[in-house]
Regions:
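A ligand-binding cleft/hinge motif common to bilobed small-molecule-binding domains
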Residues: 70-80, 151-181
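Central regulatory/effector-binding core of bacterial HTH transcription factors
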Residues: 13-76
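Alpha-helical "hinge/linker" immediately C-terminal to small N-terminal DNA-binding modules
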Residues: 1-12, 100
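Short beta-strand->loop
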Residues: 82-93, 169, 177-191
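Short beta-strand-to-loop elements that line the ligand-binding cleft
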Residues: 45-53, 119-120, 140-150
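A late-sequence structural motif
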Residues: 126, 182-202
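Secondary-structure junction motif
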Residues: 72, 96, 102-103, 115-137
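Short helix-loop capping/hinge motifs at secondary-structure junctions, enriched
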Residues: 99-109, 188, 202
């Protein structure tokens, strides 16, 4: 609900087609649930999503091809022609398959350095936060076996192997809420991210 009120305040009356840039974090639960709730109240509007990389979405928004971007906000960018509005904050967590040996290990933190990892891509903000968390924990940086931002790929890889994944909490909430994957009880310090909307300024 907050998403659409924020958009209406900037764009005016919502009608016709609303074009959305969807970053990976928003695609599995946040945006689908928001779209379903919105369309129940506004059945005459068409919503179009674009799942391109962040840089491409920004270029499309500057060109007027996208109305807004939803997902993790970039905290280290100074782009005067764009503005952002946070909806909430969340931390990253470590996911693994149910019955993974680390869930029974007396000190799972000690095993993180030698684990096989599914990680965000090297240039993704989430990857930078994760690296900083490992430095804070006094551990060597995790080395990716697979790099991907696709939630379905992460789920399939974890369910079929002993790999670990570091993701934002909401990105895989369906899997954790429905018992498809488990959370390793090792907190990742200083990985809080702001999740929200990015618009053209003005």
């Amino acid at each position: 609900e907050n998403i659409w009120s924020d958009i209406a305040a900037r764009r005016g009356v919502l009608e016709g087609t609303v074009r959305i840039g969807a970053l990976p974090l928003s695609r599995t639960r946040l945006l689908p649930s928001a779209i379903a709730a919105f369309l129940a109240q506004h059945p005459g509007i068409t919503l179009m999503t674009n799942e391109s990389p962040y840089e491409s979405l920004v270029a499309d928004m500057r060109a007027g091809n996208i109305d807004f971007i939803i997902g993790a906000l970039r905290q280290d960018e100074d782009l005067p022609d764009l503005c952002s509005e946070a909806l909430f904050e969340e931390d990253m967590l470590i996911l693994l398959r149910n019955n993974h040996p680390l869930l029974r290990h007396p000190d799972p933190r000690s095993q993180l350095a030698t684990a096989q990892w599914v990680l965000p891509r090297a240039n993704a903000p989430a990857r930078n936060l994760l690296d900083k968390a490992f430095v804070t924990l006094g551990l060597p940086l995790p080395q990716p076996t697979v790099e991907t931002g696709d939630a379905a790929m992460v789920r399939g890889l974890l369910q079929g192997s002993d790999m670990l994944a570091a993701v934002s909490a909401s990105q895989m909430r369906f899997e954790t809420d429905n018992g498809l994957l488990s959370v390793l009880p090792v907190p990742l310090p200083d990985t809080t991210r702001r999740i929200g909307l990015t618009f053209r300024a003005g």
